[in-house]
Amino acid sequence: KTYVAELMERARAAQKVAEKLAQVSRVKQVLCVTHLPQLAAMADIHFSVEKGEREGRTYTSVEELNREQRCRELARLTGGAHITAAMLAGAEELIASAEQYKAALNSKNK
């Protein structure tokens, strides 16, 4: 099966899709490319993908993020280049909420 989610504008819709992807990920592999913090926060593993140019050649770099890097990335997705302490706290809260949701899913499936 293939699931396709169109770009969502509303936070509530994004949260519902994130929860559905978390459910599906318990039995299938899910790869999600997103700019929505609600979806990104639900990831078990979070990668940052960047494209650049060097000496006339385009390159792509992929880096697995640790928790601190995830928080910074979610804060960046939320508010742009200028990251504040409040944005970092909000990102941490998103991750904690996602972890709580996934823990409840895991305990339900046992």
Regions found by a protein language model. Give the residues of each.
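Substrate-binding beta-hairpin/strand module that engages nucleic acids
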Residues: K1
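C-terminal lobe/lid and adjacent interdomain/linker elements of RecA-like ASCE P-loop ATPase modules
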Residues: V4-L7, A11-K110
